């Protein structure tokens, strides 16, 4: 997924996932709670909750934490989170989409705007950059789950629109409202996916060089580090050699 995947890979290689594990768990728990509150607390009948639990398992979140997050959805008087999307431009003119879960719109808007401004970006209005992305369902499997040929054959049969395979794994795309059905079809053949969620996929990407790439990654890391931010998407790409350098 271009910028989104490259940024996550760099953070993982730098060890940021371990250093911020408690913060990561808090974000995963928040999504589980919101998903359970918006639908049934049973993942079998709640696709969003099922996806949230899958994401938590991938990060080795303890089962007790997951169960507490689900139980919290029924607590009376707890926080009421709302989903708010922010869009803007980062260094080099890249488009950035920030998805948040917040209990205070004013606080979150101020913090997100500050991060954009401090890093040479510009927060825009809703719709400012989303037209440069496609809203799609994404299902991910590790590379050893199947061969590229077997995966694409199963993807077509399950109703996916696109399948991209490489050393990092398999990425299958479908219409957002078909995500649950496609994921179930693939699960019957390859087992539970590594992830199944709705994403923003850039239609085109902007290639970044050394200095600009460093500035962009600094901004994305600051956004990702914010407690209210759940996901960050950007339409950039960088060479493998530059990615290795940024990961050091």
Curated annotation (Swiss-Prot):
Q: Which GO biological process entries does UniProt record here? A: regulation of DNA-templated transcription
User: GO CC annotations?
Assistant: cytosol
Q: What keyword terms does UniProt attach to this protein?
A: Cytoplasm, DNA-binding, Transcription, Transcription regulation
Annotated compartments: Cytoplasm
Main location group: cytoplasm
Molecular function terms in GO for this entry? DNA binding
Q: Which Gene3D superfamilies match?
A: 1.10.10.200, 3.30.70.980
Protein family membership: Belongs to the TACO1 family.
PANTHER family for the chain: TRANSCRIPTIONAL REGULATORY PROTEIN YEBC-RELATED, TRANSLATIONAL ACTIVATOR OF CYTOCHROME C OXIDASE 1
Query: What's the protein called, per UniProt?
Result: Probable transcriptional regulatory protein Plav_2114
Gene source species: Parvibaculum lavamentivorans (strain DS-1 / DSM 13023 / NCIMB 13966)
Q: What does the organism's lineage look like at the top?
A: Bacteria, Pseudomonadati, Pseudomonadota, Alphaproteobacteria, Hyphomicrobiales
């Amino acid at each position: 997924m271009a910028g989104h995947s490259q940024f996550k890979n760099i953070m993982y290689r730098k060890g940021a996932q371990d250093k911020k594990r408690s913060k990561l768990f808090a974000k995963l728990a928040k999504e589980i709670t919101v998903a359970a509150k918006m639908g049934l607390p049973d993942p079998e009948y709640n696709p969003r909750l099922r996806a949230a639990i899958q994401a938590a398992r991938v990060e080795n979140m303890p089962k007790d934490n997951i169960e507490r997050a689900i139980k919290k959805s029924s607590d009376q008087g707890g926080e009421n989170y709302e989903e708010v999307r922010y869009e803007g431009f980062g260094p080099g003119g890249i488009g950035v989409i920030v998805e948040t879960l917040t209990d205070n719109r004013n606080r979150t808007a101020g913090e997100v705007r500050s991060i954009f401004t401090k890093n040479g970006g510009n927060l825009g209005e809703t719709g400012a950059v989303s037209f440069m992305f496609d809203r799609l369902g994404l299902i991910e499997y590790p590379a050893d789950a199947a061969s590229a040929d077997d995966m694409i054959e199963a993807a077509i049969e399950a109703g996916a629109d696109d399948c991209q395979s490489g050393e990092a794994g398999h990425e299958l795309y479908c219409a957002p409202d078909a995500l649950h059905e496609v994921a179930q079809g693939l699960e019957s053949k390859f087992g539970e996916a590594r992830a199944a969620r709705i994403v923003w996929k850039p239609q085109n990407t902007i290639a970044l060089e050394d200095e600009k790439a460093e500035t962009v990654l600094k901004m994305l890391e600051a956004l990702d580090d914010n407690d209210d931010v759940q996901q960050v998407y950007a339409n950039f790409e960088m060479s493998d050699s530059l990615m290795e350098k940024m990961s050091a």
